[in-house]
Curated annotation (Swiss-Prot):
Gene Ontology cellular component terms for the protein in this record: cytoplasm; small ribosomal subunit
Name recorded for this polypeptide: Small ribosomal subunit protein uS19
UniProt GO BP: ribosomal small subunit assembly; translation
One example GO MF annotation: structural constituent of ribosome
Pfam family for this entry, one: Ribosomal_S19
UniProt keyword Transcription regulation, yes or no: no
Family membership: Belongs to the universal ribosomal protein uS19 family.
Protein's UniProt keywords contain Cell division: no
Keywords: Ribonucleoprotein, Ribosomal protein, RNA-binding, rRNA-binding
Cited function: Protein S19 forms a complex with S13 that binds strongly to the 16S ribosomal RNA.
Coiled coil: none
Bridged cysteine pairs (disulfide): none
Length: 92
């Protein structure tokens, strides 16, 4: 269920401060964050944000199409290795 419009989008305050500082000094270094629940704002476009997936930080370059989505959507937490194949070949 989406967030109520009267509440507005959520962004972690510490992440917002890091983004504003990076935009102000035009810094291109990745911003490291653990806040997967934060919404991507328009002023984040063009920045690289390293999002924690539980094990490591995944660098994500923010584009215009990502605005309005959550950071956690772009850093997968589970690895899918495919279904295991049958070890015995069935004879007919």
């Amino acid at each position: 269920m989406p967030r109520s419009l009267k509440k507005g989008p959520f962004i972690d305050i510490s992440l917002l401060k890091k983004v504003e500082k990076s935009v102000k000094i035009n810094d291109k270094k990745p911003i490291k964050t653990w806040s997967r629940r934060s919404t991507i704002f328009p002023n984040m476009v063009g920045l690289t944000i390293s999002i924690h997936n539980g094990r490591s930080h995944i660098p994500v370059f923010v584009t215009e199409e990502m605005v309005g989505h959550k950071l956690g959507e772009f850093s997968l937490t589970r690895t899918y290795r495919g279904h295991t194949a049958d070890k015995k070949v069935k004879k007919r």
